[in-house]
């Protein structure tokens, strides 16, 4: 992980092997920009990166005056620098966008530091020739690129220290999620997932309860159990329950995650191409583990429960079948018409378990539907639920954190598509359209009336795992949901 060192000095006086200078909105007029003739000769117009080898300056373009683009550009700069021979880089403090906001300086520093730190991530566990980055340190000179309004209340140094703490915690939490999601299924089993959760619990002094199939049987979590039937003798299920309890808690929050450590589709077998990357179907459960790490280290004033349903969905003589009827923990019967709609079965029982805790808010995370990716693209998560205020708060705070989110509306016409003639509900829609919403409506069937306005469903199927670099995310897992939900919890507590 890149070490960031804060120094009370000017940018010019800071010492490092290389300088990083951002070109914001194609403005080359600042004194930190050197050798403008060279930039003109090579027609560098402030987009992407450009290395001035003579002066050892890396220029990184920020296309617009936008804090999210600053974060992305910082990440791109570090990705470039890690391929070079510099051990250290220095950078000043930049303020992009929303200069009139009281927290503008803090948010810019968070973005800068997080972008710098995330730029070094690469999942290379199984590479025989690992190329370790030479870059080890970023020196941040506590000098403003330009004055920022309304920052008198908080000194630059104080804001920088707070931002650095956030960036370190968030980077660690995101890397926990990314490493877990990227772990191949031969290793990343339900038991392995529980072991990762136990490490997080031990480090943060959290309560943890890891339950096996016998517990699931006792609690009548038959929908969850059905999904695991083909894997039971080899990779049994785990219900993981993490608990963070601060001395003062303004709210009780339950975070629920789908932890499908591998999903071949079951007897409704996926085509070969669709099976590849299904190690990422544990993205929701992994995000919950990362969130418990982040929220505990940030010391939020909320009692937080993290509930992960970890299992495989495989084929075999004991596999559950289309035409099966399952009785869920909530007592509702489910007609199975497609075994590849399995994540919602696991979540149904886990949401029932979460409601037994009587939380003030329930948020579930799942790589639930390909339909969500078709509808919103691979970079955006969907928000569903009944409470407009809660949905808006998650969307607004999530967007400010740098994640992309959009609300999808429930409606009575789509609800009819999951009706069953022989059970209380069907696990798959009778139509190919609106699949992300019908999956959310299926989960809604297992939310009790008193929790309808307390529940949010977040479908992270798109951004949880993308096979290319984008924004501050490396190839593979992104840790989708962690930044957004952390910001959501912080905003929720401000209103408590």
From Swiss-Prot:
Binding site for Mn(2+) 2: 258, 263, 281, 342
Organism (species): Helicobacter pylori (strain ATCC 700392 / 26695)
Family, per entry: Belongs to the peptidase M17 family.
First-listed, main subcellular location of the protein, grouped into a coarse class: cytoplasm
Cofactor binding note: Binds 2 manganese ions per subunit.
Name the record gives this protein: Cytosol aminopeptidase
Organism phylogeny: Bacteria, Pseudomonadati, Campylobacterota, Epsilonproteobacteria, Campylobacterales
PROSITE patterns with a match to the protein in the record: CYTOSOL_AP
Pfam families assigned to the protein according to its UniProt record, in alphabetical order: Peptidase_M17 (PF00883), Peptidase_M17_N (PF02789)
Single biological process term from Gene Ontology: proteolysis
Assigned keywords, A-Z: Aminopeptidase, Cytoplasm, Hydrolase, Manganese, Metal-binding, Protease
Active-site residue list: 270, 344
Function: Presumably involved in the processing and regular turnover of intracellular proteins. Catalyzes the removal of unsubstituted N-terminal amino acids from various peptides.
Cofactor: Mn(2+)
Gene Ontology CC terms, in alphabetical order: cytoplasm
EC supergroup of this enzyme: hydrolase
Annotated HAMAP family: Cytosol_peptidase_M17 (MF_00181)
Record field: catalytic activity: Release of an N-terminal amino acid, Xaa-|-Yaa-, in which Xaa is preferably Leu, but may be other amino acids including Pro although not Arg or Lys, and Yaa may be Pro. Amino acid amides and methyl esters are also readily hydrolyzed, but rates on arylamides are exceedingly low; Release of an N-terminal amino acid, preferentially leucine, but not glutamic or aspartic acids
UniProt KW Cell wall biogenesis/degradation keyword: no
GO MF entries: aminopeptidase activity; manganese ion binding; metalloaminopeptidase activity
Transmembrane parts of this sequence: none
Binding, Mn(2+) 1: 263, 340, 342
């Amino acid at each position: 992980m890149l070490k960031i060192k804060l120094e009370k000095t000017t940018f010019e006086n800071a010492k490092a092997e290389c300088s990083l200078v951002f070109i914001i909105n194609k403005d080359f007029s600042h004194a930190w920009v050197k050798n403008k003739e060279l930039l003109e000769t090579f027609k560098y117009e402030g987009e992407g990166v450009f290395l001035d080898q003579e002066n050892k300056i890396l220029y990184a373009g920020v296309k617009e005056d936008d804090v999210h683009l600053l974060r992305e550009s910082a990440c791109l700069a570090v990705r470039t620098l890690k391929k070079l021979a510099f051990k250290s880089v220095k950078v000043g403090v930049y303020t992009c966008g929303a200069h009139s906001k009281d927290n503008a300086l803090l948010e810019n520093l968070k973005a800068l530091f997080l972008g710098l730190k995330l730029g070094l991530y690469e999942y290379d566990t199984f590479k025989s020739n690992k190329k370790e980055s030479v870059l080890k340190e970023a020196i941040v000179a506590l000098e403003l690129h330009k004055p920022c309004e309304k920052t008198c209340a908080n000194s630059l140094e104080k804001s920088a220290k707070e931002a650095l703490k956030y960036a370190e915690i968030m980077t660690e939490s995101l890397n926990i999620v990314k490493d877990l999601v990227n772990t191949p299924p031969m290793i990343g089993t339900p038991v392995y997932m529980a072991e990762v959760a136990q490490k997080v619990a031990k480090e943060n002094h959290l309560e943890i309860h890891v339950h096996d199939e016998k517990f699931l049987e006792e609690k009548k979590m038959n929908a969850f159990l059905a999904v695991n039937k083909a894997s039971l003798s080899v990779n049994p299920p785990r219900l993981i329950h993490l608990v963070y309890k601060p001395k003062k808690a303004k709210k009780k929050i339950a975070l629920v995650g789908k932890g499908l450590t591998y999903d071949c589709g079951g007897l409704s077998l996926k085509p070969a191409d669709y099976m590849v990357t299904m190690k990422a179907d544990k993205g929701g459960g992994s995000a919950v583990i990362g969130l418990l790490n982040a929220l505990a280290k940030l010391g939020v004033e909320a009692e937080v429960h993290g509930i992960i349903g970890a299992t495989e969905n495989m084929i075999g003589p004991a596999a559950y079948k289309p035409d099966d009827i399952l009785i869920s923990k909530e007592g509702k019967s489910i007609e199975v018409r497609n075994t590849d709609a399995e994540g919602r079965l696991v979540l149904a029982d886990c949401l029932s378990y979460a409601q037994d805790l009587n939380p003030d808010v329930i948020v579930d995370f799942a790589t639930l539907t390909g339909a969500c990716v078709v509808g919103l693209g691979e970079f955006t998560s969907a928000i569903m639920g009944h409470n407009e205020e809660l949905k808006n708060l998650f969307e607004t705070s999530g967007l400010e954190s740098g994640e992309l989110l959009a609300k999808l509306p429930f409606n009575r016409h789509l609800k009819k598509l999951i009706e069953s003639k022989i059970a209380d509900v069907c696990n798959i829609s009778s139509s190919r359209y609106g699949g992300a919403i019908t999956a959310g409506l299926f989960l809604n069937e297992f939310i009790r009336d008193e929790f309808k306005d307390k529940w949010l469903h977040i479908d992270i199927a798109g951004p949880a795992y993308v096979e290319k670099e984008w924004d501050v995310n490396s190839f593979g897992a992104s840790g989708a949901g962690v930044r957004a939900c952390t910001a959501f919890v912080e905003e929720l507590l401000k209103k408590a």
